Design a protein with these regions (language model features):
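Extracellular loop-to-transmembrane helix junctions
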Residues: 35-61, 144-145, 388-396
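Membrane-water interface regions at transmembrane-helix termini and the short interhelical loops
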Residues: 34-38, 85-101, 136-140, 151-175, ...
Length: 464
């Protein structure tokens, strides 16, 4: 165990790093294409509800467990009472973090490739069809995909190698600032394009057709997973950041702030993408390549397209990388806490391990394209399913039960830790019944019926 725990430079550093871990491509890449797939406004409303009702409370439990134990999610359950079988929750968190990076790193690699395209200007002047062909050519290249994956893993571990303040905190502050400014600029361009009104209607006028097509429980289940993924909660990714927080302030305000800021960025990203998609005749349900085929068309419609595209791809690569680095920080800390390794040794071990684990995602759209689990288009989508639909909800459930059950850490310990400090909001005791009974039962219900809809009812042609 580490004798002296690293800490953030202040509340701003804590918030920025948490936001960096939360925002990332979950908001810029996954949320837009899932919004397109599941019908727009209704999906957004459901995700918003789940952020406030599910994700923020779970985030508070992760922060509390992290600060109370002074450990990462891998060892926190061994340090805090009652120990015993709860330590296996730490192992589930380790698996969940690796699963997350097994598909996420490759998407980060694609953003790096588009940064290169932004520098070279190779997308400038292309037609919408040519932009789409460029995306397909990139994902179809095994060599390019593998090289991009290795580059992201090496860079992310390089940041964690430098330490908390010099590494992940400093990088997060710079990257998030650049990205948010660029999003706002591109948003205004997107909503002023001819035909953008249809995209705004898609985002803000509910349409029940998606419910009838995919099933109510299916969409509700996916919305819950998106909310948890959007805040990176359920697999202990945020627990480690709680362990870096001092006892000077209560945790509820910070958890709420991270949730609201994350949701705000979600809305900004959607406003940046969908009006432009409709303006250029790009289907909102185009899939995971939505941002890679929509945004170049925005730039090609703007004066000074080279400068704007370059700046945006810099920002996109930054925000994608900041999330990957934040999760890698968690894995590095796990090695330090669990095995007593130095930071440098843990970073190097994880570098090798991640290259091996992420290789299937690098090849799944090209030379291993024929190797797919049933009902999944490629291995990357299978890893996404395991993370969002299984690991995150199950992990969130275990964190909540651990913090509220007498057989776990218990409500009294959780409540005391969440409210320790002289600054910030008091987490209300009146929410005990909700946290103890309603929240865990709701997660179980949605998790079960979402999978029933996917695996049992849908193949029978039954949509509920």
């Amino acid at each position: 165990m580490n004798k002296e725990r690293e800490s953030f430079s202040g509340r701003l550093g804590f918030i920025i790093v948490s936001i960096s871990c939360a925002i990332g491509l979950g908001n810029v890449w996954l949320m837009p294409y899932r919004t397109g797939m599941y019908g727009g406004a209704l999906y957004i409303l459901l995700v918003t509800a789940f952020v406030f009702l599910f994700a923020i409370p779970v985030l508070l439990t992760e922060y509390s467990v992290g600060r109370g134990s002074g450990q990462s999610g891998a060892t926190a359950f061994e340090v805090l009472p009652p120990g015993g079988a709860w330590k296996f929750n730490g192992y589930l968190g380790i698996i969940g973090n690796y699963l997350l990076l097994m598909f996420y790193v490759m998407v980060c690699g694609f953003t790096l490739a588009y940064l290169g395209k932004g520098v070279s200007g190779s997308l400038i002047g292309l037609s919408p069809e040519e932009v789409t062909d460029s995306w397909r050519a990139l994902t179809g290249s095994a060599g390019a995909s593998f090289g991009l994956m290795v580059a992201i893993v090496a860079a992310g571990m390089g940041v964690t190698y430098m330490g908390l303040r010099k590494g992940i905190e400093r990088v997060g502050k710079i990257m998030m600032g650049i990205f948010l400014v660029l999003i706002v600029i591109l948003l205004f361009r997107s909503i002023t394009l001819p035909g953008a009104g249809a995209g705004l209607a898609f985002l803000f006028v509910p349409n029940l057709d998606s419910m009838r097509e995919h099933g109510t429980f299916r969409i509700i289940h996916m919305s819950m997973g998106q909310a948890l993924f959007s805040l990176s909660v359920g697999i202990g990714s945020m627990t480690v950041f709680g362990s870096y927080v001092d006892k000077q302030r209560r945790l509820f305000r910070d958890a709420f702030t991270v949730g609201v800021l994350d949701l705000g960025v979600v809305i900004l990203c959607l406003l940046m993408i969908f009006p432009a998609a409709f303006a250029f005749g790009i289907s909102p349900s185009v899939g995971e390549g939505l941002i890679f085929v929509t945004l170049p068309n925005i730039f090609n419609s703007m004066p000074g397209s080279y400068i704007w595209s370059l700046l945006f791809y810099v920002g996109l690569a930054f925000v994608a990388f900041s999330t990957a680095a934040a999760v890698m920080e968690n894995l590095t800390t796990i090695g330090m806490d669990k095995f007593g390794w130095t930071r440098k040794k843990s970073a190097l071990v994880n570098l090798v391990l991640l290259v091996v684990l992420c290789t299937p995602s690098a090849f799944t759209r090209n030379i291993w394209a024929g190797i797919t689990p049933p009902t999944f288009p490629h291995l990357g989508s299978f890893f996404t399913f395991l993370t969002m639909e299984i690991a995150l909800p199950v992990g969130a459930l275990l964190y909540v039960v651990y913090c509220t059950s007498k057989k776990g850490w218990g409500w009294d310990n959780f409540f005391k830790e969440a409210n320790t400090g002289e600054e910030g909001w008091i987490f209300p005791a009146s929410l005990r019944f909700y946290m103890t009974y309603i929240l865990p039962l709701a997660i179980i219900f949605i998790l079960i019926f979402g999978q029933v809809q996917r695996w049992i009812l849908a193949p029978m042609g039954i949509v509920i």
